[in-house]
Amino acid sequence: MKATFPLLTGLAAALLAGAPKAMADRDSDFWLPENMAKNECTSVHITYGPKEDTHTAAYQEVVVEKSAPGSYFACNNFTTGYIGVQQLVENYKDGTPVRVAIFSVWDAKDSGDNPHAAPESERAKLIQRGPKVMTDRFGGEGTGGKSMRVFDWKEGDVIRTLVVEKPDGEDFRQITGYIFDPETQKWELMSSWRVQALRRGLGGGCGFVEDFRRNGESRFHERRATFGPALRYVNGVWKPATEFTMTKDANPNMNINCRFNPARGYFSLATGGDIAENPDFRVFETHELPQQPAPVAVDPAVQKLVEAPLLPVKEQEPYTEPRWQELDMED
């Protein structure tokens, strides 16, 4: 059958995926740790260190080794947004999963979870979107602007992302997300947003693995990915992350781990299924890589994007229809 997908992320995507409606209320019992344990895999994160809050660009590589319906593999969760890839719950008629890329930027100020509550002057303003990219407002986990596109990544692929911040006068900044498309062999624009400059620098920086299906059954499926290299651009110099910290959410399930992946030379995160803890890398511990990774030569195309001039700001770029293109889905 033909189906259209609402352009949803976070809580809204989980509701579409069959999770209980109670999860839309952050004060509901759904979010009690004991109930989280029954409904979902534990969310696990890996922070890229040392801390470089003033960096103005961030390049990450992630390899997904194992996925499941309703999975989010964030390549970079910076202070005011995130970029990564997802496997949706639905499949195409031939049984292959629907997979997408996502880039979101939060509004500069906290306006709760209602995307319509933020004053227009405080909203992230869409400047430009890439081909095949859909854009809209989001809520439910703070508020801001989101962009998504069909992106047929595979297990074992090297997923490459880039986020760039540029000052836009004294009061604003532009934040732009790109993803490398292996089919075109080019960096492709996800979207660019203009936000109030309450801070400078992308800040933060971590990857995570999340089960957003949260329907009880999804916790029995393993999700695993390796994160790195991670480079931050500080004062004109690319600096690699050299230490990594594992964290988790409030879910008490401990079938999670972080361990060194010698094939990639970086740490992997895993959650769900029959995963067992790694006693050599426990939650909230920080570790350096056990062996020196190969030097990363920054793609000249990446440097060109980092050094590109500001985009012209006119009127708000109109959002796309908040639905996916028609896809040939299973009945």
Regions found by a protein language model. Give the residues of each.
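Short, aromatic/His-centered strand-loop micro-motif at the edge of beta-sheets
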Residues: 138-158
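Secretory/extracellular carbohydrate-interaction modules
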Residues: 25-132, 305-307
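Bacterial N-terminal signal peptides
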Residues: 9-15
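Activation corresponds to long, low-complexity, non-globular regions
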Residues: 26-70, 205-209, 214-331
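N-terminal signal peptide c-region/cleavage motif recognized by signal peptidases
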Residues: 17-19
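Short, basic/aromatic beta-hairpin or loop at an interaction surface
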Residues: 130-140
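Bacterial N-terminal signal peptides that target proteins for export
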Residues: 1-8
